[in-house]
Every structure is written in structure tokens, then in C-alpha cells.
Regions:
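Catalytic metal- and UDP-sugar-binding loop of GT-A-like glycosyltransferases, i.e.
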Residues: 72, 98-100
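Conserved donor NDP-sugar-binding/catalytic core segment of glycosyltransferases
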Residues: 107-140
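Short beta-strand/loop segment that forms part of the nucleotide-sugar
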Residues: 43-53, 72
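Short, well-formed alpha-helical segments that are part of the catalytic scaffolds
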Residues: 25-38
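Glycine-rich, basic loop-to-helix element that forms the pyrophosphate-binding segment
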Residues: 73-90
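Short aromatic/hydrophobic "clamp" motif used to bind/position activated sugar donors
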Residues: 95
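A conserved acidic beta->alpha catalytic loop
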Residues: 49-59, 102-103
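Cell-envelope/extracellular polymer assembly enzymes that use nucleotide-activated donors
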Residues: 14-17, 45
């Protein structure tokens, strides 16, 4: 790779996709999607791995252009394998895994997660994973 190409890659913002397994998504999921649209750091694809097409209702999710829904059966669902399958639909540099009831508290979630990858250890070690804290709803 040429030095010019390395510089271009260093200046390019990492692309971010979000993978969300769902089962009977409701109002909280709709709020989650709306908060992902408001993020200060752009989200590429929102990849939804929905269990049981019969429980999917487009109402409330229209107009979200980067929403990619893939349906699977209950028999196909597995916590790890479903997330892995969802990740295969992404070509992003960073993939954020969320649950369908985890609504970001503010518009900085993705920005802060991406920022973690810019950090380096004392000897130049790179961050390979970052996570965010999830707060319970007030009614829990």
C-alpha cells in the first residue's frame, strides 16, 4: 500500500453499521430506531434480524431508509449465530450490536463508541472492542 493510500485511509471516518436481533418489536424498538437516526455519528445500515415474519409490522418504521430487515424462523434463532449472521450483511469497519429494547439515552452513543477505537495503549496497542452501559427503564 502506498503512503498516499495509507494517509487517505487514516483520514477516512470508519463506517458503522448496527445489528439488532428482534422478536415482536414494539414501541421501544421504534424509539431505538428514531434515536439511531439522531446520532451525531452517521449510522450506515441498521440490520434487523427479525424472528418470525408474522410478528413484523412495518408501521412505525416507514421512512427509515437505511433499515435492512432479514426474517428468520424461531428454529433458526440463536443468540450468537443470529448476530453473526447479521454481521455478514455488513461491510462496515465497525459493527455495533444492540438489543431491540436498548434505546440510546442521547445522540452521542455511536460517536462515543467509535471514539474508543481511536484510543491507543501506552505502547500503541489498539482497542478491538468497546461497549456501552445500558440503563434500565424508570418502570423497572
Amino acid at each position: 500500500m502506498t503512503e498516499e493510500r495509507k494517509s487517505e485511509n487514516a483520514l477516512r471516518k470508519p463506517r458503522v453499521d448496527v445489528v439488532i436481533p428482534t422478536y415482536k418489536p414494539g414501541k421501544k424498538f421504534s424509539r431505538l430506531l428514531k434515536m439511531l437516526e439522531k446520532q451525531t455519528y452517521p449510522v450506515g445500515k441498521i440490520i434487523v434480524m427479525n424472528t418470525e415474519k408474522a410478528f413484523w409490522n412495518e408501521k412505525g418504521f416507514e421512512g427509515i431508509g437505511n433499515l435492512h430487515v432479514h426474517h428468520l424462523t424461531k428454529a433458526e434463532f440463536d443468540h450468537g449465530a443470529t448476530r453473526n449472521r447479521g454481521m455478514r450483511f455488513s461491510r462496515a469497519d465497525i459493527v455495533v450490536f444492540m438489543t431491540d429494547d436498548a434505546v440510546p439515552a442521547d445522540e452521542f452513543l455511536i460517536e462515543k463508541l467509535v471514539g474508543a477505537f481511536e484510543q491507543r495503549g501506552p505502547e500503541g496497542e489498539a482497542v478491538i472492542m468497546a461497549y456501552a452501559r445500558q440503563l434500565p427503564d424508570k418502570d423497572c
